[in-house]
Amino acid sequence: MKKEIWGFYPPPIGGISIYCKRLAEKLHAIDESVIMRDFAQSGYESECVMRVKNRILEFLKLPFVPKRLIHAQFTNFYLLMMLYLFGWKHDIVLTLHNRRIVLLDGWKRKVVNQLFRRAKYIIYNDPAYTALLREKYDIDSGKIVLLPTYMAPEQSEVKGLTTELEEFINKHEYSISSNAHRVINNVFGDLYGIDQLIDLMNRLVNEKGLDVGMVFCIADIFDHEYYDKCVARIEELGLTEHFCFAVNSPVNGFEVWAHTDLFVRATMSDMEGV
């Protein structure tokens, strides 16, 4: 039986895509029959990564191909729905990387509930998530597997800092770093706590008189309107020289953290990678 990881290979660079990359490469090194189908359409291909050129067609083919084990890393409802509609022939394993699923209601929740019933295993990374999931969905406890979704980086991933980042960090007496996959301001507020970090820097620099630099790595701005508001707030507080937004930077987040004095993850989202 074929064994496939269905997810997103970087770019875009984010916690889930980096995890998928490392998982696919490590499992393929153990068992060459394990491959990853990349739904990110990044254009990257290797002996263990197969690019999905047409997402819809990939799902439509499922009833007509030999049975396989599919380990899905999706959080997008519509991809989960397609897997439910066309993946009935196959063994399904789901990894839930965040709590977005518990926010679904109505017919969407019913679809996901049916997918959960069909799945062989449901992997998640937060013990506190159990109660939330079982409150919303009819899940057999025997299917639930607690497994941290973190894999340490390989030495081959180390690239070094850009000259711009290195100079910014070195010119300040103290340095703090943080990161976000995207700039998101939703019903829960600022998901990655940029507003809190601005307030923190205001207290440290303007109220306490400390020379601190903040490096904030962002893979994708996404919400440009909110991002512009954050930048305007930084300018208003006179903190422009103390903030560096590394947007879509080729530098690895873990290397930035290693070169700064403190890493802060001001978020309500999952943070096992820290």
Where are these regions (language model features)?
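Acidic donor-binding loop of glycosyltransferase active sites
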Residues: 242, 258-272
